[in-house]
C-alpha cells in the first residue's frame, strides 16, 4: 500500500475476523527498503517474502495485495510457485503499475495524505475528480510523464513548499511530533510509487482475481479499463474481475471481506 505498513488493511482484517490464520508482511528496515533500486523493488521483495514463507514451512497459501502491495504479491506468488508452494488464490485489490513518470510532487502528496486517511480537502487539495481531470489533461500533452508543475495551476496547489509542510505536519499530528518517522514514511511512500512505475515483468503462470473499486483513483486515467488491461496481461491463467464499493483509498472493508469469503460466480468475471 505504499507506506510499507498494514495501516490501510486494518478495516479488512477486522472484517475477516479471527476464523482463519492471517499473516501480514510489512517493512521493518526502512534503510534496507530504500536501498533497493526502485526498478527492482517489487521483484526483490517478492523473492524475500517467498523465501521467508517457504522457510517457515508453508506449502499452501492465499495471497492478497492492495495498491503497490498487489505488485509485490504478484512477485511473491511467482517465487512461491518456483519453490513448490501452492498458491491457492491470488487476490489483487486496486493495484496498478503507474503508466507514466510522476514528476509533480503534488500528486505524491495527495496520494500520501489520502493513504493515511487525512482530510485532503482541509489540506488544500481539490476534489479527487478535479484532480483526476487535471492529471488526464496534462497526460494528454505528455503521456509518458506528469511534469513537475502540471498541477500547480489548481487552486491551493501553487506553493509546493507550503503544501508539503501542511501534509507532513498533518501526517504526524503536530509541527514537531515524530518528524523523523513521518519523513521516513513519506520517503518510503515515494520509493514505492517509483517502483510502481517500473516496466511490467514476465507474467504469472497462475490465475488471479482483481477487485476494482467503483469510484476509481485520480492517479490513473480510465482506472477500471487500465487495471483490467494490466492484470489480464500479468497472468497466464484466468483473471476474474470484480467491482467493489468505494474508491481506491477506502475500498478495504466489510464489502470486500464478504467478496473474498464466498466463491465467485463464473458470470462475475469478464
Q: Language model features by range: what are they?
A:
Residues 1-270:
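A hydrolase-biased, glycine/serine/histidine/acidic-enriched motif that marks catalytic-domain neighborhoods
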Amino acid at each position: 500500500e505504499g507506506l510499507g505498513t498494514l495501516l490501510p488493511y486494518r478495516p479488512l482484517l477486522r472484517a475477516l475476523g479471527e476464523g482463519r490464520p492471517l499473516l501480514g508482511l510489512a517493512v521493518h528496515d526502512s534503510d534496507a527498503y530504500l536501498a533497493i533500486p526502485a526498478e527492482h523493488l517489487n521483484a526483490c521483495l517478492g523473492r524475500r517474502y517467498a523465501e521467508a514463507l517457504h522457510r517457515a514451512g508453508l506449502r499452501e497459501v492465499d495471497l492478497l495485495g492492495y495498491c503497490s502491495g498487489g505488485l509485490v504479491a504478484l512477485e511473491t506468488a511467482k517465487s512461491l510457485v518456483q519453490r513448490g508452494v501452492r498458491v491457492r488464490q491470488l487476490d489483487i485489490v486496486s493495484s496498478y503499475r503507474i503508466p507514466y513518470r510522476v514528476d509533480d510532487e503534488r500528486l505524491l502528496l495527495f496520494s500520501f495524505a489520502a493513504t493515511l486517511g487525512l482530510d485532503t480537502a482541509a489540506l488544500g487539495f481539490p476534489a479527487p475528480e478535479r484532480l483526476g481531470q487535471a492529471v488526464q489533461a496534462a497526460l494528454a500533452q505528455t503521456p509518458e510523464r506528469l511534469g513537475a508543475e502540471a498541477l500547480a495551476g489548481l487552486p491551493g496547489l501553487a506553493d509546493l513548499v507550503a503544501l508539503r509542510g501542511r501534509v507532513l505536519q498533518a501526517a504526524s499530528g503536530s509541527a514537531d511530533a515524530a518528524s523523523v518517522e513521518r519523513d521516513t514514511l513519506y520517503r518510503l511512500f515515494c520509493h514505492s510509487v517509483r517502483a510502481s512505475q517500473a516496466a511490467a515483468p514476465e507474467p504469472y503462470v497462475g490465475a488471479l482475481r482483481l477487485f476494482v473499486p467503483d469510484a476509481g483513483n485520480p492517479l490513473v486515467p480510465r482506472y477500471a479499463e487500465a487495471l483490467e488491461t494490466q492484470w489480464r496481461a500479468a497472468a497466464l491463467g484466468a483473471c476474474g474481475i470484480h467491482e467493489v464499493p468505494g474508491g481506491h483509498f477506502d475500498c478495504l472493508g466489510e464489502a470486500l471481506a464478504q467478496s473474498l469469503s464466498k466463491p465467485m460466480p463464473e458470470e462475475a468475471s469478464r
